[in-house]
Amino acid sequence: MATNVKKVKKLRPKNVTVGIAHIHSSHQNTIISFTDKQGNVISWASSGSIGFKGTKKKTAYAATLATAAAAQKAREHGMREVIVELKGTGQGKEAARKQIITSGLNILLTKDVTPVPHNGTRPPRKWFKRQEKR
């Protein structure tokens, strides 16, 4: 019996010279995605996709390796300059930004787009208990 073999298309380089690096650093993980100016994802990586599990995903070292992997893919697509958008309060935010520089990409602008409530809704009860212990 013959089996059907799927043909896998090889991705062509997109030739994007200027893009945006979105770095989302939470308390558990760091997600990095490189997009073009319109927001189409060119490459991405996270601490979990690199192979880290559990509490090791939130470390700055894991964010560094994830950024290096995503930046390498972005450079293969022709990206040379990036605008960095940082979001979140995790450990890997600054480590990821520094890794972008060492991976050979020029940073044009750095923005912190962390959402900050202007006295929005009341936080849940468990938040108050945590604040009292500090």
From Swiss-Prot:
Biological process terms in GO annotation: translation
Basic residues compositional bias, start-end: 123-134
Pfam families cross-referenced by the UniProt entry: Ribosomal_S11
Signal peptide: none
Molecular-function GO term, any one: rRNA binding
GO cellular component: ribonucleoprotein complex; ribosome
Record region (Disordered): 114-134
Xref: InterPro entries: Ribosomal_uS11, Ribosomal_uS11_bac-type, Ribosomal_uS11_CS, Ribosomal_uS11_sf
Keywords recorded for this protein, A-Z: Ribonucleoprotein, Ribosomal protein, RNA-binding, rRNA-binding
Function recorded in the entry: Located on the platform of the 30S subunit, it bridges several disparate RNA helices of the 16S rRNA. Forms part of the Shine-Dalgarno cleft in the 70S ribosome.
Family, similarity comment: Belongs to the universal ribosomal protein uS11 family.
Family matches, as HAMAP family: Ribosomal_uS11
Subunit structure of this chain's protein: Part of the 30S ribosomal subunit. Interacts with proteins S7 and S18. Binds to IF-3.
Name this polypeptide is given: Small ribosomal subunit protein uS11
